[in-house]
Amino acid sequence: QFKEAIDDFDKFIRQENKVADAFICRGLSYLHLKDTTRAYENFNTAIRTNRENPNGYNRRGGLHLQQEQYKEAEADFNKAIECDSAYLLSYFNRALVYNATNRPMQALADFDKVIQLDSTNSLTYFNRAMLRTQIGDYNHALEDYDKVALYSPNNVLVYYNRAGVYAQLGEIERAVEDYTSAIKLYPDFANAYIYRGRLRELLRDPQGAKEDRSIAQRKIAEYRSRLNDSTYSIYADTTQRFDRLLSFDSKFAGGSFDRITGHNGGHEEMRLLP
């Protein structure tokens, strides 16, 4: 699929070699084929072709970020924002750079900017919530998780993570409720049973705690047996279901994002904080 796409872009570029997006798309195709050298060359050519297009800088910055070349990534995201001060994805990506280089307050400021420009972006709320949790700002983290639950109600991780914040704040019953919500969405979620069991001990519910421990142990044993099972493919549906539960409705709004190229509208660039 991507090799055919590269052939098509080659033909187009032979006829029209002044279209930056063609080089960006060809670079993305190489990136999907794990050819980072040619991807980088194409992003460079896109930038030389149109130095005012933020997409070229953002794509090259994304490649630098992927390769943990944070200084170069930051410079590219800065340039993209200089080209278009409302280019959300570069604020988002620069926040990832700031987080990776231990600058949480600057990362928060960039996530704030993304949300200011796109107030329903659940993945940005989720990342900001995790960052706020890391710095101990639990109440604001809860507010962000509430937004994620509003915009992506079937995302299992929001309930799991929010439960941890409630537990930190001593709101044990609400934490149990969230672990229960996570389990309803994904009944094989062993960790959710483990943590709910511990909290049930605190709530003087030894029977419930024992049941959760037992279920967790069974789920873990089942998972391990699947890993060793030659018919593992029969369990693929469960894995795919979990992947779907982790998905976010994270389509960015705004004019700049309408220009993003890529096989799913740019979603593949957005990522969770590590």
Where does each model-flagged region fall?
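Alpha-helical tetratricopeptide repeat
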Residues: 1-274
